[in-house]
Structures are given as structure tokens and as C-alpha cells.
From Swiss-Prot:
It catalyses: L-aspartate + 2-oxoglutarate = oxaloacetate + L-glutamate. The keyword Nucleotide-binding does not apply. It comes from the Eukaryota. Homodimer. This is Aspartate aminotransferase, mitochondrial. It is an enzyme of class 2 (transferase). GO terms for biological process: 2-oxoglutarate metabolic process; alpha-amino acid metabolic process; aspartate catabolic process; aspartate metabolic process; biosynthetic process; glutamate metabolic process. Keywords: Aminotransferase, Mitochondrion, Pyridoxal phosphate, Transferase, Transit peptide. Its EC number is 2.6.1.1. The lineage of its organism: Eukaryota, Fungi, Dikarya, Ascomycota, Saccharomycotina. GO terms for molecular function: L-aspartate:2-oxoglutarate aminotransferase activity; pyridoxal phosphate binding.
């Protein structure tokens, strides 16, 4: 009898389909997927120029001297070294104080202190820049808008982050055209969209992502005059700027100088009527080498007009800022509960120690000088006629403008790995591979882009 029942039960198995079978296969990540593929290749000439991680002249991922010294201090400090408890939802108080001082007093000395003194900044420690963007996206989709403008081209993960956090309409504005920044096309697109929005009586202000410096992937940044024109337009159209500052310091070698866009956005004298806030997404992955520690921050800065121009100096925080604080905490709690501790301790030690901070500034400048050297080495070796903007590009990358087919040929025939959009990570170039790399690029550049 039992055997009969078991036999009958087994008859159902071929007809039962798990609900998990509906799950489709996602495509490999456009950057990290290539890096994984690279590891399986056996060719001795292979070069990985995909991931934006700084490497030294021997191809090794290094620890900044300032970070190494901070780590030793943490190891020698028993209380810091052994503390494995949870951080608060929004991160450690020390991290908040040190990072806000760096961002809004040192990087923005003219206007930042005004916002700090009037408690107009809500701050959250996040899982690097990606986490900052994700928290910002969730907050914006819940309360402000589900429309966003992303540069074309842009970091591949931008679209993914905002799609996954509730954004319904993702538009692309023209950033790059014929080797230059397409300022006119960019502004015209935004104005046309704003006009159509007005005609449709859509009152939700669209968001817009702005790369603070070292635009990824092109490496081309607007001039100060162009930035003023862009911010004038964004504030006039009541858009919500999301400033992605992943590469502070890597444009000029000066951490403070590279915060120009943030200083411009916060200029209360120039923009007294801006109303929809600024979302600053910042990371210490690139400029402190803390890639795996996932340490960054989100700052939501609000103007006086957002609180009907009212400010009570007797209040610790105005009611609007308290509302924003509470919602950010709720989002973080539901997303990852609290941030990791070790990376923030490293940042705290570096930012709070005068000598270590000075060493950090030197570390960043040294890194940028090496990237400049690599850029110049390649510039001298390559004989391309369209290298005009090569020297104008900044940061960790060179944008080759290769077609997807050329990138594929470079990968399959020469074992040189670029991202699919033709972005090349300069820190992967060194004395041992620069000749082979340039020969490979030269050969592929002569091929028909549409071949």
C-alpha cells in the first residue's frame, strides 16, 4: 500500500514546475563580468583595463601610505580594533562630523558652513557611492519624482540603480558629441522636456545626474563657464540635481579644487531661488583606495525656500530636515540596516589627524601624476589623428570611442580588455605592457568601426 502511494506520488514529479523556473538569466555585469572573464584567459599578453581600481607601475593594487598608517593606528588602539558592534543606522557620529567638515567646510568654505550652521544637511553613511545613489533613488522615487535624466554616455550602473529603486522614466541627455561635451544639445533637451512637462501639467520635478568631475567614461568635464550655464538651466527648470562625486581629487590632484560643482550648486548668492534640494553622493573608494570597504555618504542639502523660508535658531533642526532624516533612516533600515564599521574608522583616522590628512592629499596627487604620466606615454606612442581630446580628459580612464565591434576584436584577437563602451582604465597600463597595448590599439583603430 505504501509503495503504491509512493509510486503514485512520483508520477506527479514530471508535471510539477518550480516557480523559480520563471527566473530569466540576467546578462553579465558590463564591467565586473568582463573582469571575471579575463581571469580565465591564459594568454601571456592579456591586459585587463576594465575595472576602475588604481594600480601601481608594477600592476599591483596598492594601499595609500596615509591609509596604511591609519590602519596601524587602529590595530594599536584596542578599543577600535576589537569593537564589532553595529554602527547606528546612519553611520558613526565621528564619521558624520569628519566627512561633513571635509565636504562642507574645507571643500566649500564660502557657502558650506552656512548650510551646516542652519542645519540644512541630512547626512547618511552609505555603502560607498553605489549605496548613496541607491538610498537617494529610493527617497526620490517615494517622495519627489520617478523621472530622471542620465548622461549619454554614463556609468553603466546608474540606470540599473534607479530602475531597481522605483524610477519609471529614465531619459538620456546628450553629453558627448564628436569628441567634445555637447553643452548646447544637453541644455536644449532639458528645456524641451520641461516645456512638454508644463504642457502636460506634470508637477513632479525631474531629477538629473551630474558627474562632479572626471566624467565616467569620457573623462571630459565642463569648464567653469559651462557648468554655470548648466546649473542656471537646471535651477531655472526646477530640476533636482544628483551630484555623483566618486572621483574627487582625481581631476586636478587637489581634493578641494575638484569640488567646484558642489560649490557652485551651493552658491546662495547666485541662486537664491533654488528650491528642490541637492543630493550629493560621495565615495572614498577611488580617492582613498577603500574599494572593498564600501564607505561613502549621501548628503541631502535643502534651501531656505524648501521650508517656506522659515528658520528658528532655537530649534536643533527645522521640521523639514527632521522629516528627511527620519525617512532616510527608514530607507537604510529596510535596505541594509546599518553600514560597515572598519572603512569608516580608517576615514575617521585619516580625516581627524592633521599629518595623515596632509599625507592623503599627497597620496592623491601622486596617483594623479602617475595617471597623467601614463596618459602622456600613450599620447606619445599613438599616431591617431583624433587625439585632440586625449590630453583634455581627466581621471582614471581614457575614452577610445571604439565601436563595440572594435572592442570585441581588441579582446578576442589581442587579449586587451576594455569595457563595452570603449573605456580604458589607465592605471592598468605600465612599462611592461604599454608598447603592446599601443600597438594593439593602433591596429584596431585602423579597422572600420562598422565592420
Amino acid at each position: 500500500m505504501l509503495r503504491t502511494r509512493l509510486t503514485n506520488c512520483s508520477l506527479w514529479r514530471p508535471y510539477y514546475t518550480s516557480s523559480l523556473s520563471r527566473v530569466p538569466r540576467a546578462p553579465p555585469d558590463k564591467v565586473l563580468g568582463l573582469s571575471e572573464h579575463f581571469k580565465k584567459v591564459k594568454n601571456v599578453n592579456k591586459i585587463d583595463l576594465t575595472v576602475g581600481i588604481y594600480k601601481d607601475g608594477w600592476g599591483k593594487v596598492t594601499t595609500f601610505p596615509s591609509v596604511a598608517k591609519a590602519q596601524k593606528l587602529i590595530e594599536s588602539h584596542l578599543e577600535l580594533n576589537k569593537n564589532l558592534s553595529y554602527l547606528p543606522i546612519t553611520g558613526s557620529k565621528e564619521f558624520q562630523e569628519n566627512v561633513m567638515k571635509f565636504l562642507f567646510k574645507e571643500s566649500c568654505p564660502q557657502f558650506g558652513p552656512f548650510y551646516l550652521a542652519h542645519d540644512r544637511i541630512s547626512f547618511v553613511q552609505t555603502l560607498s557611492g553605489t549605496g548613496a545613489l541607491a538610498v537617494a533613488a529610493k527617497f526620490l522615487a517615494l517622495f519627489i519624482s520617478r523621472d530622471i535624466w542620465i548622461p549619454d554616455p554614463s556609468w553603466a550602473n546608474h540606470k540599473n540603480i534607479f530602475q531597481n529603486n522605483g524610477f519609471e522614466n529614465i531619459y538620456r541627455y546628450s553629453y558627448y558629441k564628436d569628441g567634445q561635451i555637447d553643452i548646447d544639445g544637453w541644455i536644449e533637451q532639458l528645456k524641451t522636456f520641461a516645456y512638454n512637462n508644463q504642457q502636460e501639467n506634470n508637477k513632479n520635478p525631474p531629477c538629473i545626474i551630474l558627474h562632479a568631475c572626471c566624467h565616467n567614461p569620457t573623462g571630459l568635464d565642463p569648464t567653469k563657464e559651462q557648468w554655470e550655464k548648466i546649473i542656471d538651466t537646471i535651477y531655472e527648470l526646477k530640476m533636482v540635481p544628483i551630484v555623483d562625486m566618486a572621483y574627487q581629487g582625481l581631476e586636478s590632484g587637489n581634493l578641494l579644487k575638484d569640488a567646484y560643482l558642489l560649490r557652485l550648486c551651493l552658491n546662495v548668492n547666485k541662486y537664491p531661488n533654488w528650491s528642490n534640494g541637492i543630493f550629493l553622493c560621495q565615495s572614498f573608494a577611488k580617492n582613498m583606495g577603500l574599494y572593498g570597504e564600501r564607505v561613502g555618504s549621501l548628503s541631502v542639502i535643502t534651501p531656505a525656500t524648501a521650508n517656506n523660508g522659515k528658520f528658528n535658531p532655537l530649534q536643533q533642526k527645522n521640521s523639514l530636515q527632521q522629516n528627511i532624516d527620519s525617512q532616510l533612516k527608514k530607507i537604510v533600515r529596510g535596505m541594509y540596516s546599518s553600514p560597515p564599521g572598519y572603512g569608516s574608522r580608517v576615514v575617521n583616522v585619516v580625516l581627524s589627524d592633521f599629518k595623515l590628512k596632509q599625507q592623503w592629499f599627497k597620496d592623491v596627487d601622486f596617483m594623479v601624476q602617475r595617471l597623467h604620466h601614463v596618459r602622456q606615454e600613450m599620447f606619445d606612442r599613438l599616431g591617431w589623428p583624433d587625439l585632440v581630446n586625449f590630453a583634455q580628459q581627466h581621471g582614471m580612464f581614457y575614452y577610445t570611442r571604439f565601436s563595440p565591434k572594435q572592442v570585441e576584436i581588441l579582446r578576442n584577437n589581442y587579449f586587451v580588455y576594455l569595457t563595452g563602451d570603449g573605456r580604458l582604465s589607465l592605471s592598468g597600463v605600465n612599462d611592461s605592457n604599454v608598447d603592446y597595448l599601443c600597438e594593439s590599439l593602433e591596429a584596431v583603430s585602423k579597422m572600420d568601426k562598422l565592420a
